[in-house]
């Protein structure tokens, strides 16, 4: 009878430890995924959208600034 009691206690401790580890892994996964941003969201926030104020090309999402506003598209220049 004592062996059965000890065996049940050991099993209960192992199950408790396993459940706790599972909860920690799930929480770590939730934390990791909540910190990530979709690339589209990151892209929108890191640059100025079309017709926003700018001074250099790198400020615009289109990478095209006419020294005042962001252009919709970086038009190729045809040598004049």
From Swiss-Prot:
The presence of a 'disulfide through disulfide knot' structurally defines this protein as a knottin. The cysteine framework is VI/VII (C-C-CC-C-C). InterPro entries: Conotoxin. It is found in: Secreted. This is Gamma-conotoxin PnVIIA. The modification 4-carboxyglutamate is found at residues 59, 71. Expressed by the venom duct. The keyword Disulfide bond applies. The lineage of its organism: Eukaryota, Metazoa, Spiralia, Lophotrochozoa, Mollusca. One of its GO terms (molecular function) is ion channel inhibitor activity. The keyword Repressor does not apply. Residues 20-43, 78-80 form a propeptide. Keywords: Cleavage on pair of basic residues, Disulfide bond, Gamma-carboxyglutamic acid, Hydroxylation, Ion channel impairing toxin, Knottin, Neurotoxin, Secreted, Signal, Toxin. It comes from Conus pennaceus. Residues 1-19 form the signal peptide.
């Amino acid at each position: 009878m004592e062996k059965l009691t000890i065996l049940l206690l050991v099993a209960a401790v192992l199950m408790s430890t396993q459940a706790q580890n599972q909860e920690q892994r799930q929480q770590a996964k939730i934390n990791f995924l909540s910190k990530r941003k979709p690339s589209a969201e990151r892209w929108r926030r890191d640059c100025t959208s079309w017709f926003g104020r700018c001074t250099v090309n790198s400020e615009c999402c289109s990478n095209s600034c006419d020294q005042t506003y962001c252009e919709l598209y970086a038009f190729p220049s045809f040598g004049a």
